[in-house]
Amino acid sequence: MKKIVFTGGGTVGHVTLNLLLMPKFIEDGWEVHYIGDKRGIEHQEILKSGLDVTFHSIATGKLRRYFSWQNMLDVFKVGWGIVQSLFIMLRLRPQTLFSKGGFVSVPPVIAARVSGVPVFIHESDLSMGLANKIAYKFATKMYSTFEQASSLSKVEHVGAVTKVSDQKNPEPDELVDIQSHFNHKLPTVLFVGGSAGARVFNQLVTDHKKELTERYNIINLTGDSSLNELSQNLFRVDYVTDLYQPLMELADIVVTRGGANTIFELLAIAKLHVIVPLGREASRGDQIENAAYFVKKGYAEDLQESDLTLDSLEEKLSHLLSHKEDYQAKMKASTELKSLADFYQLLKKDLS
């Protein structure tokens, strides 16, 4: 039986594509393994998926671009993670390793290359993260969501592979209940803060609940169960799975962070959106770059977190609603999306 090892983690964005691809390989008779951190979100997501995947936990350390005494400790963690991954590779002898990035992916990628296993990696953002910059040196091939510099000879631009489904499923009962609390004469605004929510969105909704619910139906994915609430024109919930796409479709506008996975999902369904990227003080600036790209393409509006107020947000919402057809036409004309089926066939071809 053919074997494939997946890796990637730290955030849902570094796991999502793996979760989409693994069932395809399982259906085609592959034995699927995953290398990650048992304390990480990758382990949680695989357990929730119920997929027949063998999980191997390794030591992992954070790769920092700045000086920290923790770098010394993490060097040893990464080194031990490489040794652990090497033993896993030598024991399994897989046909390939597929990496979606994140700090936990570096040891398996290095170990795979050392043990002669082909390495395929995927980069979602406009600029490569530190983990994938390291991984690229050991990769057989990298697939990218955005166009990359021509000097990167191992990169193939494939566009975004999203988890948005074309299949229309019956409305969940919970969605019907939510809609019964909404005023259908008002536009619906969905706040999406990533897998852990976004405190800035949560605070905005909390501070301006009255004003917001007078003018909009508000859906707030918070990442915090203490904020859960269903009331007139307001639905706040910490986490959703089956409700995710129905809520996306229900919304007239989405206010989101600038993670590539989420914004390309919105592009795939031509959904109006305002991007509030994580600032450089909290990230390497990849979300700012992603947001600027989407604004330049005419897909979205952006708003820096430092400028986010009720008034500034309402100005963006009003602009999007009044120019809805223009934004949607540009999104529908995009050629930057790839279906899961097409990407899977491309990957299988490259593996052969």
UniProtKB/Swiss-Prot annotation:
It is found in: Cell membrane. It catalyses: Mur2Ac(oyl-L-Ala-gamma-D-Glu-L-Lys-D-Ala-D-Ala)-di-trans,octa-cis-undecaprenyl diphosphate + UDP-N-acetyl-alpha-D-glucosamine = beta-D-GlcNAc-(1->4)-Mur2Ac(oyl-L-Ala-gamma-D-Glu-L-Lys-D-Ala-D-Ala)-di-trans,octa-cis-undecaprenyl diphosphate + UDP + H(+). GO terms for molecular function: undecaprenyldiphospho-muramoylpentapeptide beta-N-acetylglucosaminyltransferase activity. Belongs to the glycosyltransferase 28 family. MurG subfamily. GO terms for cellular component: plasma membrane. It holds the Pfam family Glyco_tran_28_C. It is a peripheral membrane protein. One of its GO terms (biological process) is regulation of cell shape. It comes from the Bacteria. It comes from Streptococcus pneumoniae (strain 70585). The keyword Glycosyltransferase applies. Pathway: Cell wall biogenesis; peptidoglycan biosynthesis. Transmembrane segments: none annotated. This is UDP-N-acetylglucosamine--N-acetylmuramyl-(pentapeptide) pyrophosphoryl-undecaprenol N-acetylglucosamine transferase. Keywords: Cell cycle, Cell division, Cell membrane, Cell shape, Cell wall biogenesis/degradation, Glycosyltransferase, Membrane, Peptidoglycan synthesis, Transferase. Its EC number is 2.4.1.227. Cell wall formation. Catalyzes the transfer of a GlcNAc subunit on undecaprenyl-pyrophosphoryl-MurNAc-pentapeptide (lipid intermediate I) to form undecaprenyl-pyrophosphoryl-MurNAc-(pentapeptide)GlcNAc (lipid intermediate II).
